[in-house]
């Protein structure tokens, strides 16, 4: 299985993740995918051909193997890693959409040169607003997928130790036959390692959800105690808000009113018509 494409996609998300999220990604790729690709696939590579039962009855080996190993450990872990990594793509799509809006605003303001557009693509997006919800939802889904696969693994293979010998009496076996599993010790070691890595990822996901909620509450408390000034506020999200647009309209009206009063001061003999218009504008 080629994991390069998945790694490329998730590396982009890593730039906008929290510190705990970056640790989670390291655990995913170093302790799980690398071990799965380099070692585990070779250990389980001959599991079907080396599963031998002490009978010559045609079909008995295949039926017994399917009974005790309904899905290969390697394929189950591969499916788990793909589904666990998929929610992170929600964050990547949200960040791409947000950067697209920022580029659009730059073009509307006359700053659509390649240098500014590249700067938008490179800068780190803060986890706030709707992106905060997207990020939290993705972490929760990661947590649910990890827990669901741990439960499925427990249902399929109770215990973590790989047995050396199994007894099978499924049809078409003529009687109860003994079947031998290849490399049971190696498979037990890798099973324990992968389950431990999955448990670490669950702990990291829980810690990241708690961290995100705590940081959002702290930010909200800080905003209530120190409301942000309008002068220092920037960013494209603020420029798109209705409050910003209304403030700009009021500013233009006040500037127009001030310039009209200036004209009246400089030429006092222009008549009462302009004064009336000025008063009318002020009343508006």
Curated annotation (Swiss-Prot):
| Membrane topology of the entry | Multi-pass membrane protein
Q: Name one GO molecular function term.
A: gap junction channel activity
Q: Which stretches face the Cytoplasmic side?
A: 1-22, 96-130, 215-284
Q: Where are the transmembrane segments?
A: 23-45, 76-95, 131-153, 192-214
Q: What is its main location?
A: membrane
Coiled coil spans: none
What is one Gene Ontology biological process annotated in the Swiss-Prot or TrEMBL record?
cell-cell signaling
* Membrane topology, Extracellular segments: 46-75, 154-191
Annotated Gene Ontology cellular components are: connexin complex; cytoplasm; plasma membrane
Functional note? One gap junction consists of a cluster of closely packed pairs of transmembrane channels, the connexons, through which materials of low MW diffuse from one cell to a neighboring cell.
**Subunit-level organization:** A connexon is composed of a hexamer of connexins. Interacts with CNST.
* Name of the protein in its database record: Gap junction beta-1 protein
Q: Which organism is it from?
A: Bos taurus
- Give the encoding gene's name: GJB1
């Amino acid at each position: 299985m080629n994991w390069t494409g998945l790694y490329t996609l998730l590396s982009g998300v890593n730039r906008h993740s929290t510190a705990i999220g970056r640790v989670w990604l390291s655990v995913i790729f170093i302790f799980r995918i690398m071990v799965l690709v380099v070692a585990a696939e070779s250990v389980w590579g001959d599991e079907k051909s080396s599963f031998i039962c002490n009978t010559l009855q045609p079909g008995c080996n295949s039926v017994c193997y399917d009974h005790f190993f309904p899905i290969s450990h390697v394929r189950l872990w591969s499916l788990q890693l793909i589904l666990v990594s998929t929610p992170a793509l929600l964050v990547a799509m949200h960040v791409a959409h947000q950067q697209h809006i920022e580029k659009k605003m730059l073009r509307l303001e006359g700053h659509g040169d390649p240098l500014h557009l590249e700067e938008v693509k490179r800068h780190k997006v803060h986890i706030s607003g709707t992106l905060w919800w997207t990020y939290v939802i993705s972490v929760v889904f990661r947590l649910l997928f990890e827990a669901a696969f741990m439960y499925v693994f427990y249902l399929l293979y109770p215990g973590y130790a790989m047995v050396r010998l199994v007894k099978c009496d499924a049809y078409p076996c003529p009687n109860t036959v003994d079947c031998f599993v290849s490399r049971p010790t190696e498979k037990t070691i890798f099973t324990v390692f992968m389950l431990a890595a999955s448990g670490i990822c669950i702990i990291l996901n829980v810690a990241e959800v708690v961290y995100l909620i705590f940081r959002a509450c702290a930010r909200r408390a800080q905003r209530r105690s120190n409301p942000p000034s309008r002068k220092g506020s920037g960013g494209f999200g603020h420029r798109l808000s209705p409050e910003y647009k209304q403030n700009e309209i009021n500013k233009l009206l006040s500037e127009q009113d001030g310039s009209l009063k200036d004209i009246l001061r400089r030429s006092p003999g222009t008549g009462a018509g302009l004064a009336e218009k000025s008063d009318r504008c002020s009343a508006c």
